[in-house]
Amino acid sequence: MSATDLDPTDLDLAELRAERARLQTLDDAVSYVRRLAQARLDLAMAEKTARVTGEAVISSGDVTGELPRLLGSHLTGGAARPPRPAEDFSDHPLAIELDELCSDAGSADLPTLTDDQLGEYMTALTEFEHRVSLQRKQVFERLDALSAELVRRYRDGEASVAGLLDD
């Protein structure tokens, strides 16, 4: 039985903190990959819109100039939690899977894809993003349970804030 299967009340304080830290890192990685998938889907949707309107949104081979405008809809007023030091998640298995999905679809040059290829690519991205979102939700639920147990232990005196300074 792994730490992720255990009831948080069965973990000692060190295990509880370690599992919470591990899941926070996993959440960061999953969130990063989810944002990448959403950005790639935004680019594909912009290409699809350009085909319908007849106005080139992405010039062939050069997307970089359009990125702020195309991806601006995902920018928010701030983080929902305090920021943690950023890590490079480009080698995370989900990031590699997304890169392979995009490479297999020929997404490097969206304007050269046929309408059918673009549609298939968008479907694959949407399915991938939904799967990653579900995984992220499951990580959040586990983090919430671990955090609630930590709070309970501090509140009930089973753990002390002074103990954090000793760690």
Place the predicted regions along the sequence by residue:
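Charge-rich amphipathic alpha-helical interaction elements
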Residues: M1-D167
